[in-house]
């Protein structure tokens, strides 16, 4: 053991062996229980649907003011007894390594005590962050994260910027954080409110979401990560000779290797990194991602093993949909976390694409919920869409102005929960930094609250009562289409300051599924690494999204086991372009069974499909740059479905075989109409022929119209029944999937 960590280990052992706060009997026992296809909370032997209220960052946090009292009472009256609260342990981390008990009482215990006064039946999920405090960073500067874009900015606390923070590679930080977390858990379990804790949400890094500190600043070039990177290289390559051969650098050694700088990260002429020339970059990002995974594994296990009762443990992770700097954030090892015995649930907000958050939007969760369910975990959505009760919106969200708009949005959110057998918490934004606490529209609220209106709370109560009953019936998820996305692919994409990569990623990760929601079909989303685990016999169509890294072995499996049974198989952009060792356009042709060749287009590429034009829109603006590599289909044996605008070059084509059909889109496929046509011809059920959002499964069918769309709708149920609706613009209707009865309108 390293001497400098000896005192930490001794202190931890002392705390574990003879705590000053012996555990009080009667701690809550909680676990996930899978009932009739859904994951529910079993809390002290009673089942709860996974719906919570979460106000820790708002003006409503304190139950002792009127804002808090009213909102806690609202959710109590709506039948929601589960509440999330936050504790930032760096605020209670004393310089001598002990826990500041009065600060914990002030920031957490007294708040929970006040909530219990309002709702004696409340149980608590505690979100815990344990960032290093500033005094710790000053004491141990060699343990800090550094950024390739520039020096640490000691004047900012914005964790997306170059703020001072402990490196996730720091062994000292991890060991000393263990000590403070252990003291916190030991103390919490002695309190009256600690007996009501059923779950811990383990927060980490930027925004509690396990995105690496300063991920847009290209971390981590600091000493701690450099040490870890060298150890990682030693484990992988063993000898300097092997490293030199892999990196094509006769001068490098394991002992002198450093984290790549900005020039190395930024240098690239196209969308892809060449694994034969840029192995150093690929190696660092693998080390970076493994570091985050290691820290998560450590702390989730630590919480499980140091809480003397059964307790749920989860974290934010697995973000795909929306916008992300995938290499530098921290989710590329999500597939391995899904197998962790110490993680019960994963969480994330809704997709930030405006088609998800606009009026009439999809409310798409950011993660691949199909894989979460497949692995027996629970997915919890942070229901953070802004209602009309907050004066300003954020990102791409519509600024709602009426109860009716907000109710429609809440219904779409709820439909996602029911159809995916997931859960969520209602995130409170009133008084959140940057968000005005009161409405900007007349009449003003007397008290703050993102949901504090009779209409919204009535809707929330109705939804809760419905779901309390729905979970007693078998869960049915009759999706006909499966989408697969590959996190390993992102290692081979040159993301740093590269607009063309950004546009390809955005189209594949966002618009592909956004248009699928409006095609009228029900679909599931999975990790590509789960391809062999999924029961493919359920699906009429399989869509490979961002899956550009496919091994020879996987290609055989796809050709033998996916392309069969009359199934439609759709590939996008550059499927199998790399196997992890090289880039080869011939592999695209091999998997698509079409003649594919590179094409050079000197303007931002646009596809024309069914008379509509689709470019690579990102950040709310059209495609700005040419893309390289770009491909065309040069095959006389295909059916042409789309061309590049202003050219005869084929961009989308279909090839029918006796037992399956392949579609290849050389840019990520777009167009609800084209998808509807392809899915219908493959035998998938189409609920609605209008371009409305359709969410189906779990006993419901949801239809949501845009603000500029409405009118007569014919909804086709799977049992042959038809339901005629006259829908207003910007509204959401939820039907019973079997009877067609209107449940929410």
Segments and roles (model prediction):
Residues 129, 137-339, 343-344, 349-352, ...:
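Polysaccharide-binding and catalytic clefts of secreted carbohydrate-active enzymes
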Residues 20-75, 472-473:
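N-terminal carbohydrate-binding accessory modules
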Residues 406, 545-745:
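A conserved amphipathic helix/loop scaffold
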Residues 309, 314-511, 600-628, 639-643, ...:
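Hydrophobic targeting/anchoring helices
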Residues 65-154, 185-189, 299-307, 549:
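Aromatic-lined substrate-binding rim segments of carbohydrate-active enzymes
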Residues 49-63, 86-105, 159-179, 276-294, ...:
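The substrate-binding groove and active-site-proximal loops of carbohydrate-active enzymes
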Residues 16-17:
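C-terminal motif of bacterial Sec signal peptides marking the signal peptidase cleavage site
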Residues 66, 334-335, 515-534:
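A short, well-structured beta->alpha microelement
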């Amino acid at each position: 053991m390293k001497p400098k960590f000896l005192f930490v280990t001794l202190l931890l052992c002392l705390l574990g062996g003879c705590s000053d706060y012996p555990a009080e009997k009667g701690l809550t026992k909680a676990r996930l229980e899978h009932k009739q296809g859904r994951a529910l909370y079993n809390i002290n032997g009673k089942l709860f649907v996974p719906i919570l209220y979460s106000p820790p960052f708002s003006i409503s946090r304190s139950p002792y003011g009127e804002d808090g009292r009213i909102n806690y009472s609202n959710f109590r009256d709506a039948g929601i007894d589960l509440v999330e609260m936050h504790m930032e342990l760096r605020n209670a981390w004393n310089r001598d390594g002990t826990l500041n008990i009065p600060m914990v009482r002030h920031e957490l215990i007294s708040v929970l005590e006040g909530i219990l006064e309002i709702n004696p039946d409340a149980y608590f999920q505690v979100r815990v962050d344990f960032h290093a405090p500033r005094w710790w960073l000053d004491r141990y500067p060699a343990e800090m994260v550094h950024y390739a874009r520039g020096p640490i900015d000691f004047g900012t606390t914005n964790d997306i910027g170059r703020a001072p923070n402990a490196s996730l590679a720091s062994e000292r930080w991890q060991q000393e954080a263990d000590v403070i977390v252990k003291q916190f858990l030991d103390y919490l379990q002695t309190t009256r409110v600690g007996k009501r804790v059923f779950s811990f949400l383990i927060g980490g890094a930027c925004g509690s979401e396990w995105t690496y500190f300063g991920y847009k600043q290209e971390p981590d070039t600091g000493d701690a990560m450099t040490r870890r990177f060298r150890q990682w290289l030693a484990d992988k390559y063993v000898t300097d000779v092997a490293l030199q051969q892999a990196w094509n650098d006769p001068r490098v050694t394991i002992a002198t290797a450093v984290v790549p700088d900005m020039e190395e990260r930024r240098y690239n002429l196209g969308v892809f990194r060449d694994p034969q020339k840029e192995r150093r970059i690929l190696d660092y990002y693998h080390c970076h991602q493994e570091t985050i995974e290691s820290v998560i594994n450590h702390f989730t296990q630590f919480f499980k093993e140091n809480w003397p009762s059964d307790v749920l443990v989860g974290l934010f992770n697995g973000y795909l949909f929306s916008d992300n700097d995938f290499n530098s954030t921290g989710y590329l090892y999500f597939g391995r976390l899904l197998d962790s015995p110490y993680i019960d649930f994963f969480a994330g907000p809704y997709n930030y694409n405006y088609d998800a958050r606009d009026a009439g939007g999809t409310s798409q969760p950011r993660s691949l919920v199909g894989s979460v369910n497949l692995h027996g975990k629970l997915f919890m959505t942070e229901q953070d869409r802004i209602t009309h009760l907050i004066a300003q919106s954020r990102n791409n969200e519509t600024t709602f102005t009426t109860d009716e708009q907000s109710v429609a949005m809440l219904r779409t959110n709820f439909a996602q929960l029911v159809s995916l057998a997931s859960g969520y918490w209602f995130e409170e934004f009133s008084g959140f930094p940057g968000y005005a606490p009161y409405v900007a529209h007349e009449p003003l609220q007397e008290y703050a609250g993102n949901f504090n209106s009779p209409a919204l709370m009535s809707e929330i109560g109705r939804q809760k009562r419905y779901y309390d009953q729905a979970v007693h019936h078998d869960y049915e998820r009759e999706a006909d289409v499966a989408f697969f996305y590959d996190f390993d692919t992102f290692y081979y994409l040159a993301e740093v300051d590269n607009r063309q990569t950004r546009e390809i990623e955005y189209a594949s990760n966002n618009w592909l599924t956004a248009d699928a929601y409006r095609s009228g079909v029900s679909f599931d989303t999975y990790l590509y690494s789960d391809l062999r685990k999924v029961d493919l016999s359920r699906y009429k169509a399989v869509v490979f999204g961002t899956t550009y890294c496919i091994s020879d072995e996987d290609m055989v499996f796809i050709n033998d086991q996916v392309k069969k049974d009359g199934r439609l198989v759709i590939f996008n952009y550059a499927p199998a372009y790399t196997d992890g060792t090289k880039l080869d356009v011939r592999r695209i042709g091999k998997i698509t069974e079409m003649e594919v060749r590179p094409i050079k287009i000197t303007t931002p590429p646009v596809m024309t499909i069914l008379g509509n034009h689709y470019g690579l829109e990102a950040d709310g603006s059209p495609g700005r740059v040419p893309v390289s590599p770009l491909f065309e289909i040069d095959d006389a044996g295909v059916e042409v479905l789309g061309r590049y605008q202003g050219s005869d070059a084929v961009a989308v084509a279909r090839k029918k075989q006796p037992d399956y059909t392949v579609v290849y889109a050389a840019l990520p496929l777009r167009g609800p109409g084209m998808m509807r046509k392809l899915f219908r011809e493959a035998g998938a059920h189409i609920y609605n022929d209008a371009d409305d959002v359709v969410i189906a499964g779990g006993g419901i069918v949801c239809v949501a119209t845009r603000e500029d769309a409405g009118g007569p709708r014919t909804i086709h149920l799977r049992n042959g029944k038809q339901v005629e609706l006259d829908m207003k613009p910007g509204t959401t209707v939820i039907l019973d999937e079997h009877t067609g009865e209107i449940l929410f309108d």
